[in-house]
Amino acid sequence: MIQTQSMLDVADNSGARRVMCIKVLGGSHRRYAGIGDIIKVTVKEAIPRGKVKKGQVMTAVVVRTRHGVRRADGSIIRFDGNAAVLLNNKQEPIGTRIFGPVTRELRSEKFMKIVSLAPEVL
């Protein structure tokens, strides 16, 4: 569960390393975001010569959470940390590589590109 002020790792090669959630999109008083939800983030830590710079405000999709996601069969998939993938204005990933596993819940029309780039889909 990601909320405002939550810090997330970046799971792509866009140049950002850490981002902070500044808004959960979808609803006027929505408090939490889970896997597959879109959030507004600001870049807190970036590498030199990356595609994004520190202080930039971006949109991102949550790909891993410590809270996890419950499947229909009752199983829960949890991760060691929270991670997101940065998106451009057309909701496409900025980076060309995805690091770490992602869940099957991202297999919607919007995020098939992220699933195809990921090394492992759980």
Swiss-Prot record:
Keyword Oxidoreductase: no
GO BP term, example: translation
Molecular functions per Gene Ontology: large ribosomal subunit rRNA binding; structural constituent of ribosome
Keywords: Ribonucleoprotein, Ribosomal protein, RNA-binding, rRNA-binding
Record-level GO cellular component terms: cytosolic large ribosomal subunit
CDD domains: Ribosomal_uL14
Stored Gene3D superfamilies: Ribosomal protein L14
Family label: Belongs to the universal ribosomal protein uL14 family.
Complexes and interactors: Part of the 50S ribosomal subunit. Forms a cluster with proteins L3 and L19. In the 70S ribosome, L14 and L19 interact and together make contacts with the 16S rRNA in bridges B5 and B8.
Protein purpose: Binds to 23S rRNA. Forms part of two intersubunit bridges in the 70S ribosome.
Protein name from the UniProt record: Large ribosomal subunit protein uL14
Gene name, Swiss-Prot/TrEMBL: rplN
